[in-house]
């Protein structure tokens, strides 16, 4: 400002000595300055004092010639003056005030510079630039006084450094960034300021020495939810398999694979970061853990069905042989054909056995036996042939399963008529040639037929069980036969 004031005063002196020149009067100042009627010169406006909340976001306001700066609170400003300190005598007509111009290099320690600037240290102010915290501002300020604008636009004016005269004879800011007159490095960004410029590192970089180096954002948590990938001047977030970035490009959210691209053949269950496949009953996961294969239940167990297991897709079923029906899905139950349908004649009776039925004559008596109302075959005493034959024969039928466990009581014989002073004995008269049976007397009038060898069917056994009755005084002797037909079924059920 002193330099501009000195030139102005010199111009006024020349004007006063030349009577032919038109007297120049000043009516206004450039932007950022106001007229001081006392000192008769333009003075800087301290916007930091008069503008409410001039800087936002925690920035500090630093008054600047013709304007102000909003810088981080940690920023420092070193003023670079291109002229050493000078003192000039006031010209005629001025207030006589002296404005000092102080070179930054003349400051030995930190302190406040004229115009509101700051100096860091003697070593730092030796050069024309400084760094201001992480934002990397390099600021050059030229605190020369702005020139007052003459009311006569035909006269040329002197502008402060960083300004130039416009076609309207006002001092306007020089955009050093556009003009290419800045001294920012190739890896820095030039930012134009009023009357000056600043050099700043691009986003994602920080100043280290004279260079802009990449900021590794991945070392400053928590930038990313899961994975952080640093790139020159930036970074990006990645998610683990099974997750995807949310709209904020930071948070990882689970991918519901069951909704997006269901790869499961049957059932899909989403879990955090993945999914699992399950199969319906009767199927199992294949080796790829996606598809389902039928389980051959019949191969895995031989106890599923009582008779035969039939594998089907996803299930199995049980079958029974002819003469049986499936009950409770797995067991076989004999069908009583005598209660449903049979082919027996009128003179035959139907006898059901395990797995089938047979027709037997309703009158099984053979000559010389005759049928009584009690369904007994009796040999008449009057018939001479009956003297050597059993007095009566009773026909009975029973059915047993194949391979029945032994020993097993299967049939009980008992006298229907009891005579006084008689003794009854029991024996197997015929049909036990292979020793499959044993007759055990259980009382004076009864005996139990015992199966002692397992029988396999289908087959039929006819066993004659005889009861001998003898008088205790030997007056008479008689016998009765129970002809038992044993039908062995084809299966053990």
From Swiss-Prot:
Subunit structure: Interacts with ECM1. Interacts with TIMP3.
GO biological process, one term: regulation of DNA-templated transcription
Disease with which this protein is associated in UniProt: Doyne honeycomb retinal dystrophy: An autosomal dominant, progressive, ocular disorder characterized by yellow-white deposits known as drusen that accumulate beneath the retinal pigment epithelium. With age, drusen increase in size and number, and eventually cause visual symptoms, including decreased visual acuity, metamorphopsia, photophobia, and paracentral scotoma. Cutis laxa, autosomal recessive, 1D: A connective tissue disorder characterized by loose, hyperextensible skin with decreased resilience and elasticity leading to a premature aged appearance. Face, hands, feet, joints, and torso may be differentially affected. The clinical spectrum of autosomal recessive cutis laxa is highly heterogeneous with respect to organ involvement and severity. ARCL1D features include skin laxity, thin and translucent skin with easy bruising, facial dysmorphism, joint hypermobility, muscle hypotonia, and multiple severe herniations. Skin laxity may progress with age.
Effect upon mutating residue 42 to A: Produces extracellular disulfide-linked homodimers similar as Cys55Arg mutation
Misc remark: Up-regulated in malignant gliomas. May increase glioma cell adhesiveness and invasive properties.
Effect annotated for changing residue 140 to W: In GLC1H; uncertain significance; results in increased protein aggregation and intracellular accumulation
The name this protein goes by in its record: EGF-containing fibulin-like extracellular matrix protein 1
Domain EGF-like: 26-71, 173-213, 214-253, 254-293, 294-333, 334-378
GO molecular function terms listed in the Swiss-Prot or TrEMBL record: calcium ion binding; epidermal growth factor receptor activity; epidermal growth factor receptor binding; growth factor activity
Annotated consequence of substituting residue 48 to A: Produces extracellular disulfide-linked homodimers similar as Cys55Arg mutation
General function of this protein: Binds EGFR, the EGF receptor, inducing EGFR autophosphorylation and the activation of downstream signaling pathways. May play a role in cell adhesion and migration. May function as a negative regulator of chondrocyte differentiation. In the olfactory epithelium, it may regulate glial cell migration, differentiation and the ability of glial cells to support neuronal neurite outgrowth.
Distribution of this protein across tissues and organs: In the eye, associated with photoreceptor outer and inner segment regions, the nerve fiber layer, outer nuclear layer and inner and outer plexiform layers of the retina.
Superkingdom of source: Eukaryota
Region (Mediates interaction with TIMP3): 259-493
A cellular-component GO term for this protein: extracellular region
Predominant place of localization: secreted
Glycosylation sites: 249
